[in-house]
Amino acid sequence: MRASLFLIPVTLGDTEHRRVLPEYNRDVILSIRHFIVENVRTARRFLKKVEPGIVIDDLTFYELNKHTSPEQVAGYLAPLAKGESVGVISEAGCPAIADPGADVVAIAQRKDYPVVPLVGPSSILMSVMGSGFNGQSFAFHGY
């Protein structure tokens, strides 16, 4: 498989990851050595929950926040050009949904890198599902 940008969902709250994330996500996580994250500390904690035996010091983390420039983000994608996949980890829920990960996806698409969203929880989708409203005309205006 060609190196890809994987969008890796994170649990919402204290939910046990095995209850909401498929085993496939774990397999993908274990195949990646480069992660673009909102917060390195919480991303490391999440990865340790998914696989306690993971060697965190063997991984590279790139921090993505409101101070990260587009040029820095483009640099974070450099492993893709070398044939190495990169994962995007948000603070909670799905990356790139009301999240700075969207900027990473846009740059990756412009560079013609494959983007692979993985299955996981989304607070926005869950709120629409539980609202009783028709999701056909749903519009999200931010948190």
Features from the language model and the residues they span:
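Glycine-rich, flexible N-terminal cofactor/catalytic loop recognition
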Residues: 1-64
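Short, charged beta->alpha transition segments
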Residues: 70-78, 124-128
